[in-house]
Regions:
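Hydrophobic anchor at the beta1->P-loop junction of P-loop NTPases
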Residues: 9
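P-loop (Walker A) phosphate-binding loop of NTP-binding proteins
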Residues: 12
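Conserved lysine of the Walker
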Residues: 17
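Post-Walker A alpha-helix
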Residues: 20-21, 25
């Protein structure tokens, strides 16, 4: 296990992962690793037709997170520079299991295992939770903010 502090913050959408990660990184003077969602070119199509676009969407996220974690390991962890992330790569397999048909999931799982077998894993995982009512309010606010920014 890596002795350099590597903290991952996880939880459902809208729970405050990014906010807490940012605060922790600032307070502890750690590098902040933020999840990149907006760059996924398949996400819009995914929300319109999950069955058609789930495999491409999940593969993009997996490859993107693989590259991020590979870079973080090389640039920070191997140089004893601590990191806090607002996601854990394990979420990929959880989402894939929920969105992919079995045929695609089996392929995805094989790729996931190959890519993640030697990735750095956090030595601390913080899991946040909130009531469904709170999560719905927060995601509604995020959608309003995101749509106003897009204009």
């Amino acid at each position: 296990m890596n002795s350099t502090p590597f903290i991952a913050v996880e939880g459902p959408i809208g729970v405050g992962k990014t906010s807490l990660s940012h605060r922790l990184a600032t307070y502890l003077q750690f590098h902040l690793l933020r999840e990149i969602v907006e760059e996924n070119p398949f996400l819009k199509d995914f929300y319109q037709n999950i069955d058609e676009w789930s495999f491409q969407t999940e593969m993009f996220f997996l490859c993107n997170r693989y590259k991020q974690l590979e870079d973080v390991e090389a640039r920070f962890l191997t140089k004893q520079k601590p990191v806090v992330a607002d996601y854990h790569v394990l979420k990929n397999i959880v989402f894939a299991k929920r969105t992919l048909h079995m045929k695609h999931y089996n392929k995805y799982e094989r790729v996931y295992k190959v890519l993640t077998e030697d990735l750095p894993m956090p030595n601390i995982i913080v899991y946040l939770n909130a009531s469904l009512e709170t999560l719905l309010k927060r995601t509604d606010k995020q959608q309003l903010t995101d749509s106003s920014v897009a204009l």
